[in-house]
């Protein structure tokens, strides 16, 4: 598998057919970012999603969620064209190449600059776009349509000598600078320009946020910033430690996860988007631009598995910060990028949603749920982290508080890893991860001679283990089930041996893996659903990509390497043209569903690839 993934092409006449002619498939995008925020760039040269100045800020481009009101910034040839898109090797710098019927070729290179040490290149987020014609003469069309605060605020766009100035009449400002002046036509706060590029010609465009001054484009040093940005990403990706046959996809997944980190706070977000639907036209549309402690912990474990440890150190600082504010060992399941607790969910009724999928939500109502598994994932990550870092008294005090909380509260019902918005229950995976929290706390306390009531923790751990084996197992299904005393299968039970609750060679592990493979997969056995029963929400959902990778890993670990690798390779073919995945896949069409790109999916890809490599004697 090479670093550059197979590419797709886009024909505008075909893309513009159907019920939603202005919205591309979710899979038709690449992601750029500077580890403060990110932007989705389509195969058609349009930036259709970008929030500034942070991942969880209001959007300035959101045509992904409403092509009329959301805003976008497109650059592409006039008339018919085809396009391909790729990342420059070992980077998060995106290149979209357009070909016209008369043999013209123009490439658009998009990036958000970072310094050579991975920090933002300055106080103001920037997007740099290089237009380069390598063949023929091509008439280009640019449309600049910013819309602040999810399109809810009035935007004013003005043409100045050095470029465009956009504001929302309050405190938000965008500037767009260009190497040569364009003849802008501005109507209804949308600026358009036609211009011609000929072979050998190159133009730079620079978008800058929150700077009242607009400068000639040369002042932004795009060439130097491109070199520095490429140098950082190439150096970072060169440290990915994986020698198996899927190196290209493992590197791409690691690079995608790195884009979802916040360099200032150490936070790791679940995805950079909100409200991309789990079913087209459905209501399961959620905001993922926050720090789920579970997802962050899984991300750090995956990055650790491929040799990147610094991210764990940064996240531990974030974790200590939120724990100091919480007190008593209690954790929310998610926090804002800066550690804020208040993530009130609201609906943006003025937006039509992706392909008519409403409501569009910002904030997340699941923030108040109890999800016991979070404690286990955090403690598992801490156990991994401490192998390469010194355990300070302050850090242990935080972790000790978490273990104490679990020892007192593991018996409570919760909402599960799947954030069920219905009745709380005794979910088996939640109980297993509570066991993990206790087990890792005991291990760290004993191995490092740290303070803690390990005797009480051990009693709680062993009691919980026995209870799970009794009430979490179904003799009728010959499988671990979703919650105590029911018969519902749940793909989350595939992860039980991954956290060493039971060894991989245990008969109940083998039987559970076989049951999931038999009953929770699509007809062809290629994709995996989370579960099959109603969960209290309207509508349906697609197959969950993390669950498919979990099944592949589990099959490999119980000895069915052939089937495991077949499922894994099929999942690799489901990646989009630049190697990215969303949360879910529509089994009928193969189209992406859910927020994109999704950390969970890339985490599971890395872990599965690493497991396959270990079984082959590689690392």
Predicted stretch roles:
Residues 1-619:
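Acidic, mature catalytic/reactive cores of soluble proteins
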């Amino acid at each position: 598998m090479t670093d550059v993934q197979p590419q797709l092409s886009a024909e505008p006449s075909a893309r513009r057919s159907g019920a939603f002619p202005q919205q591309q498939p979710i899979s038709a995008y690449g992601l750029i970012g500077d580890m403060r925020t990110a932007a989705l760039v389509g195969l058609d040269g349009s930036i259709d999603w970008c929030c500034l100045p942070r991942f969880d800020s209001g959007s300035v481009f959101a045509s992904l969620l409403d092509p009329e009101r959301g805003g976008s910034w497109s650059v592409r040839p006039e008339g018919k064209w085809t396009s391909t898109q790729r990342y420059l090797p070992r980077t998060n710098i995106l290149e979209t190449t357009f070909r016209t019927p008369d043999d013209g070729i123009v490439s658009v290179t998009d990036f958000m600059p970072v310094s050579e040490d991975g920090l933002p290149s300055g106080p103001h987020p920037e997007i740099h776009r290089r237009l380069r014609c390598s063949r023929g003469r091509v008439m280009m069309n640019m449309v600049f349509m910013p819309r602040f605060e999810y399109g809810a605020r009035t935007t004013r766009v003005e043409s100045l000598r050095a470029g465009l100035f956009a504001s929302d009449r309050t405190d938000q400002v965008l500037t767009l600078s260009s190497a040569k002046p364009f003849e802008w036509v501005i109507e209804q706060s949308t600026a358009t320009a036609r211009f011609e590029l000929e072979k050998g010609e190159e133009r730079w465009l620079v978008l800058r946020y929150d700077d009242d001054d607009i400068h000639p484009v040369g002042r932004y040093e795009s060439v130097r910033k491109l070199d520095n940005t490429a140098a950082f990403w190439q150096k970072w990706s060169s440290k990915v430690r994986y020698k198996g046959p899927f190196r290209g996809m493992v590197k791409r997944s690691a690079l995608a996860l790195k884009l979802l980190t916040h360099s200032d706070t150490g936070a790791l977000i679940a995805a950079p988007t909100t409200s991309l639907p789990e079913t087209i036209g459905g209501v399961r549309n959620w905001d993922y631009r926050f720090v789920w402690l579970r997802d962050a912990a899984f991300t750090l474990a995956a990055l650790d598995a491929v040799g990147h440890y610094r991210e764990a150190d940064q996240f531990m600082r974030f974790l200590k910060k939120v724990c100091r504010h919480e007190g008593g060992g209690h954790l929310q399941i998610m926090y804002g990028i800066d550690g804020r607790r208040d993530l009130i969910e609201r609906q943006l009724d003025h937006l039509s949603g992706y392909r008519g999928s409403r409501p569009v939500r910002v904030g997340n109502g699941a923030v108040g749920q109890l999800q016991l598994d979070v404690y286990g994932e955090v403690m598992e990550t801490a156990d991994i982290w401490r192998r390469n870092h010194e355990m300070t008294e302050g850090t242990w005090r935080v972790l000790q508080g978490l273990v104490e909380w679990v020892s007192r509260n593991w018996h409570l019902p919760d909402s599960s890893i799947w954030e069920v918005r219905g009745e709380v229950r005794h979910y088996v995976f939640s109980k297993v991860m509570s066991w993990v929290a206790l087990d890792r706390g005991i291990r760290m306390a004993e191995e490092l001679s740290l303070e803690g009531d390990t005797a009480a923790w051990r009693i709680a751990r062993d009691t919980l283990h026995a209870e799970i084996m009794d009430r979490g197992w179904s003799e009728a299904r010959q499988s671990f089930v979703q919650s105590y005393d029911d018969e519902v299968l749940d793909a989350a039970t595939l992860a039980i041996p991954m956290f060493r609750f039971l060894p991989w060679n245990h008969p109940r592990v083998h039987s559970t893996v076989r049951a999931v493979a038999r009953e929770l997969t699509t007809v062809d056995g290629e994709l995996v659903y989370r579960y099959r029963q109603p969960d209290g929400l309207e509508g349906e959902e697609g197959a969950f990509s993390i669950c498919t990778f979990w099944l592949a890993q589990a099959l490999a670990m119980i000895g069915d390497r052939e089937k495991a690798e077949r499922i894994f390779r099929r999942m690799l073919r489901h990646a989009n043209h630049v190697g990215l995945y969303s949360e879910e896949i529509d089994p009928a069409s193969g189209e992406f569903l859910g927020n994109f790109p999704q950390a969970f999916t890339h985490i599971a890809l890395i872990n599965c690839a690493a497991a396959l490599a270990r079984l082959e004697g590689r690392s």
